[in-house]
Amino acid sequence: RYIKNNNSYIILYPDYLNKKRFHGSLTEGIYRNMQYALDNYNYKYFIVLSSRNIFYTELNPEKYKYFIKNSFKKRLNELSEKWHWPSILRSEISKYIIRNNLYFSKSAHEGVTFDYNACKDILSFLNRNDYIRKNLFEWNSCMEEFALQSICINHSQPYYDIGNGTNTNYNINDL
């Protein structure tokens, strides 16, 4: 299935997944799309879009130079009690991060962008850690705002914010 958009195509994942807000099923949808893209296409960037995304200009390869790496990373003791951390910290991926003294990272999922190597690392990590993946997809919190981003940060892979989500508007007018 395709959506035509100015002579280019957006490819939709062929199997519909019923997702819920504030639930790991959103992360599962991103994971499935990422796996599908990796298995079927050559690409440079994987962009997570939602109905909340707004682009102010045309996005094309010449705009990639404006992508700004998200470098948010904090250890457990640096996280605030606010946001969704109290719930998220009980998940298996958080326990893994804590147990291995790794970093937490976060960003709005609307417009979060991963390069090809980051996608490979995310999928490899989740496919090797089945119990984390299953728990992640079933967790009742907004896992899409931190899980994949944290995997990137801890595997020295960049991720970018190009969307108009919370606190990610720093380069939106360049895109």
Regions found by a protein language model. Give the residues of each.
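Short, solvent-exposed loop/turn segments at secondary-structure junctions
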Residues: 17-18, 53-55, 119, 165-168
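Conserved glycosyltransferase catalytic-site signature
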Residues: 23-31, 53, 141-149
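C-terminal catalytic/acceptor-binding lobe
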Residues: 127-175
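A structural signal for short, well-ordered beta-strand segments and their strand-loop junctions
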Residues: 45-50, 57, 68, 113, ...
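Amphipathic alpha-helical segments that form well-ordered structural scaffolds
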Residues: 32, 118-121, 147-154
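Conserved catalytic core of nucleotide-sugar-dependent glycosyltransferases
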Residues: 54-136, 141, 145
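Active-site-proximal specificity loops/subdomain of glycosyltransferases
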Residues: 2-44, 48-49
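Short, surface-exposed basic-aromatic patches at helix termini and helix-loop junctions that form
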Residues: 2-6, 38-39, 60-67, 154-155
